[in-house]
């Protein structure tokens, strides 16, 4: 008889129905999240597999066909970008550049008498340069820094007058700057240059009061300011970015070395190389900007002679790099 019985569906109570609905909903949420996670994983895999050329093609495609909702109206920020034109070179992300390799001599001194003798030797070399009105000399300083106590006393002065040799003077044992080094730095024929060099002179004066900052500030050259004048760029420069833009070289500005104990004697090989490269590349940058300035002044003089002052002012008023545009303009 049992096999002929028909089993009627059992009516579930409301609590059981609710629990089943909740379980079904949670299951759907889990499936949805799992699907999203899988899609994200696949996208990341594809992104990581993209070659630089593929990434560049995607960026070009996006720039050529921007989303409509972005291009439907011009915002204030977009107007300012259009008015300002392309980004300044100092703000552009540099391409992969070769690192600076310095193979010249590094002359390192820690004793007052040794520093004085070396500075006197450099000064004699400067005075022998009879064909030069000024002798450019890259100048930089290093000191220890602590987040608890702040900057320490000036510990290292490094200079470079010839790219084949850099001088590193450690001041840790000194209570006073040797007279010969002070005379070299203040020599009327020496043109000190660097990045943010005025701040270095002010710190040097604070740490060694016998060194007056103002005379040095009056005759020094800030490479960033000079670059803006010659290359018609804008903004503030770091030495690293100037090396990228002017010398087309990358610098290894290791934080470990930069924040190291510059007051401890002796300096290690990494510290010596770091100090030497800073002034070496500074000297390279100076000579390159000097060469560009010579070419620029020559081009401007020729343009004025051919087209007159009015045309020259018109071209300068375009707000574009004169060196790159001068041959394209027809008056």
From Swiss-Prot:
<keyword id="KW-0269">Exonuclease</keyword>
<keyword id="KW-0460">Magnesium</keyword>
<dbReference type="GO" id="GO:0006139">
    <property type="term" value="P:nucleobase-containing compound metabolic process"/>
</dbReference>
<comment type="similarity">
    <text>Belongs to the WRNexo family.</text>
</comment>
<feature type="binding site">
    <location>
        <position position="142"/>
    </location>
    <ligand>
        <name>Mg(2+) 1</name>
    </ligand>
</feature>
<feature type="modified residue" description="Phosphoserine">
    <location>
        <position position="80"/>
    </location>
</feature>
<dbReference type="GO" id="GO:0005634">
    <property type="term" value="C:nucleus"/>
</dbReference>
<feature type="compositionally biased region" description="Polar residues">
    <location>
        <begin position="31"/>
        <end position="43"/>
    </location>
</feature>
<feature type="region of interest" description="Disordered">
    <location>
        <begin position="27"/>
        <end position="92"/>
    </location>
</feature>
<protein>
    <recommendedName>
        <fullName>3'-5' exonuclease</fullName>
        <ecNumber>3.1.11.-</ecNumber>
    </recommendedName>
</protein>
<dbReference type="InterPro" id="IPR051132">
    <property type="entry name" value="3-5_Exonuclease_domain"/>
</dbReference>
<dbReference type="GO" id="GO:0003676">
    <property type="term" value="F:nucleic acid binding"/>
</dbReference>
<dbReference type="Pfam" id="PF01612">
    <property type="entry name" value="DNA_pol_A_exo1"/>
</dbReference>
<dbReference type="InterPro" id="IPR012337">
    <property type="entry name" value="RNaseH-like_sf"/>
</dbReference>
<feature type="domain" description="3'-5' exonuclease">
    <location>
        <begin position="118"/>
        <end position="290"/>
    </location>
</feature>
<dbReference type="GO" id="GO:0045950">
    <property type="term" value="P:negative regulation of mitotic recombination"/>
</dbReference>
<comment type="function">
    <text>Has exonuclease activity on both single-stranded and duplex templates bearing overhangs, but not blunt ended duplex DNA, and cleaves in a 3'-5' direction. Essential for the formation of DNA replication focal centers. Has an important role in maintaining genome stability.</text>
</comment>
<dbReference type="InterPro" id="IPR036397">
    <property type="entry name" value="RNaseH_sf"/>
</dbReference>
<dbReference type="GO" id="GO:0046872">
    <property type="term" value="F:metal ion binding"/>
</dbReference>
<feature type="compositionally biased region" description="Basic and acidic residues">
    <location>
        <begin position="47"/>
        <end position="67"/>
    </location>
</feature>
<feature type="modified residue" description="Phosphoserine">
    <location>
        <position position="88"/>
    </location>
</feature>
<feature type="binding site">
    <location>
        <position position="278"/>
    </location>
    <ligand>
        <name>Mg(2+) 1</name>
    </ligand>
</feature>
<feature type="binding site">
    <location>
        <position position="140"/>
    </location>
    <ligand>
        <name>Mg(2+) 1</name>
    </ligand>
</feature>
<dbReference type="GO" id="GO:0008408">
    <property type="term" value="F:3'-5' exonuclease activity"/>
</dbReference>
<keyword id="KW-0539">Nucleus</keyword>
<keyword id="KW-0378">Hydrolase</keyword>
<keyword id="KW-0597">Phosphoprotein</keyword>
<keyword id="KW-0540">Nuclease</keyword>
<keyword id="KW-0479">Metal-binding</keyword>
<dbReference type="InterPro" id="IPR002562">
    <property type="entry name" value="3'-5'_exonuclease_dom"/>
</dbReference>
<feature type="binding site">
    <location>
        <position position="140"/>
    </location>
    <ligand>
        <name>Mg(2+) 2</name>
    </ligand>
</feature>
């Amino acid at each position: 008889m049992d096999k002929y019985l028909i089993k009627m569906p059992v009516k579930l109570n409301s609590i059981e129905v609710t629990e089943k609905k909740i379980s079904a909903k949670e299951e759907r949420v889990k499936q949805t999240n799992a699907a999203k996670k899988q899609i994200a994983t696949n996208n990341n895999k594809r992104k990581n597999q993209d070659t630089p050329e593929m990434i560049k093609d995607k960026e070009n495609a996006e720039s050529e066909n921007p989303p409509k909702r972005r291009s439907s109206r011009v915002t204030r920020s977009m107007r300012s970008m259009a008015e300002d034109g392309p980004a300044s070179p100092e703000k552009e992300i540099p391409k992969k550049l070769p690192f600076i390799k310095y193979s010249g001599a590094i002359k390192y001194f820690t004793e007052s008498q040794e520093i004085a003798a070396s500075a006197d030797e450099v000064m004699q070399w400067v005075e022998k340069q009879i064909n030069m009105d000024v002798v450019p000399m890259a100048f930089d300083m290093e000191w220890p820094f602590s987040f608890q106590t702040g900057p320490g006393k000036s510990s290292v002065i490094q200079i470079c007058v010839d790219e084949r040799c850099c001088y590193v003077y450690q001041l840790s044992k000194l209570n006073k700057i040797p007279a010969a080094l002070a005379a070299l730095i203040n020599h009327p024929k020496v043109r000190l240059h660097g990045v943010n060099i005025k701040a270095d002179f002010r710190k040097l004066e604070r740490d060694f009061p016998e060194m007056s900052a103002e005379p040095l500030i009056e005759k020094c050259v800030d490479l960033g300011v000079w670059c803006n004048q010659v290359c018609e760029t804008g903004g503030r420069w770091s030495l690293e970015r100037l090396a990228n833009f002017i010398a087309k070289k990358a610098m290894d500005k290791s934080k470990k070395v930069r924040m190291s104990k510059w007051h401890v004697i002796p300096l290690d090989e990494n510290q010596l190389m770091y100090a030497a490269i800073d002034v070496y590349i500074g000297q390279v940058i100076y000579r390159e900007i000097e060469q560009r300035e010579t070419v620029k002044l020559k081009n401007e003089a020729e343009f004025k002679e051919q087209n007159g002052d009015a045309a020259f002012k018109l071209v300068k008023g375009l707000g574009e790099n004169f060196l790159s545009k001068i041959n394209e303009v027809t008056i």
